[in-house]
Amino acid sequence: MGAGGRMSVAPNNSKCEKKESRSVKRVPHTKPPFTLGQLKQAIPSHCFKRSLLRSFSYVVYDLSLSFIFYSIATTYFHLLPSPITYIAWPVYWAFQGCILTSVWVLGHECGHHAFSEYNWLDDTIGLILHSSLLVPYFSFKISHRRHHSNIASLERDEVFVPRLKSAIPWYSKYLNNPPGRALTLVATLFIGWPLYLAFNVSGRYYDRFACHYDPYSPIYSDRERLQIYISDAMIFVAAYVLYKIAMAKGLAWLVCIYGVPLLIVNALVVTITSLQHTHVALPHYDSSEWDWLRGGLATVDRDYGVFNKIFHNATDTHVIHHLFSSMPHYHGVEATRAIKPILGDYYLFDDTPIHVALWREAKECLFVEPDEGDNNNGVFWYSNKF
């Protein structure tokens, strides 16, 4: 397992304790010897072109698969003998959850104006796709744009902002064990996304309550408030449709067909996005050191195997996405290959199996602090040493 060739794992001589001693080469935190313009010149020009037809084909493909899974479940599952249904339903939930996560990714693509050349069309499609997954489209689009503008800044980044060692809750040390870690991971995966939207959990610090559903939240400016009302209205419409379905089909039917897959979407969104920004080799910066390019490079591409394609390469092309966020997802792999020779050690790739990476980062990335005796006091690294 490695991080772009920069992670080495010492042999494990204690099989009983199964402890690993890692020597991780960190991503450089000094100003890079290249510019954003030089990176752009290295990328084929067609990678920046957005094709409405091609983008829309992914929407049709994902929604068609989702409908096929739905049709199979509602048409045939009730005909199966009881023991088989206990297998069929979890398979449906997994498949449907993965495809709906792909739909979530396409909505996110619309929010970056990476879907087509038409802003209004991108927003219309993104609003429909995200609202169907109970995501307030414009609310998330705006906060996510600020995340891209301030990534890896301890003061201004919008999400996955690590705590300083001095600011971690008193109970954190008591959760720093396998049972506590497992409990925290399960809660984070399945309710972390709605908690972020509703209560700004893991988000940037504000001096008052921040919520993605509140048009007067400190997250938004006066000129953005109308968009928040539109997002809320669409969430209300989606919730009303779900209510009518529950009344017609029953709550249990709705939970099986839609509710559980939506939980899977929540878990996958948190898994993908948290692992894109959490790694012991990645720096964070305070205002004395931060700049946009170094912040944009403080992210990691990971390998999800066949799921890279299923999730439209949101998993293994996140570095290029932060550098050129309006680039369509279907050009991300080619563009990444083009700039890797220039990025050198500034590019981080980790092919650690995802379940292993989740557990490792939950164990090792508890808070950030500067290195002792380091003159770069504005550069912070993940640690778990209380």
From Swiss-Prot:
Motif range (Histidine box-1): 108-112
Domain of life: Eukaryota
Reactions it catalyzes: a (9Z,12Z)-octadecadienoyl-containing glycerolipid + 2 Fe(II)-[cytochrome b5] + O2 + 2 H(+) = a (9Z,11E,13E)-octadecatrienoyl-containing glycerolipid + 2 Fe(III)-[cytochrome b5] + 2 H2O; (9Z,12Z,15Z)-octadecatrienoyl-containing glycerolipid + 2 Fe(II)-[cytochrome b5] + O2 + 2 H(+) = a (9Z,11E,13E,15Z)-octadecatetraenoyl-containing glycerolipid + 2 Fe(III)-[cytochrome b5] + 2 H2O; a (9Z)-octadecenoyl-containing glycerolipid + 2 Fe(II)-[cytochrome b5] + O2 + 2 H(+) = a (9Z,12E)-octadecadienoyl-containing glycerolipid + 2 Fe(III)-[cytochrome b5] + 2 H2O; a (9Z)-hexadecenoyl-containing glycerolipid + 2 Fe(II)-[cytochrome b5] + O2 + 2 H(+) = a (9Z,12E)-hexadecadienoyl-containing glycerolipid + 2 Fe(III)-[cytochrome b5] + 2 H2O
Localization of this protein: Endoplasmic reticulum membrane
Keywords from the UniProt entry: Endoplasmic reticulum, Fatty acid biosynthesis, Fatty acid metabolism, Lipid biosynthesis, Lipid metabolism, Membrane, Oxidoreductase, Transmembrane, Transmembrane helix
Pfam family, any one: FA_desaturase
Protein name according to UniProt: Bifunctional desaturase/conjugase FADX
Organism: Vernicia fordii (Tung)
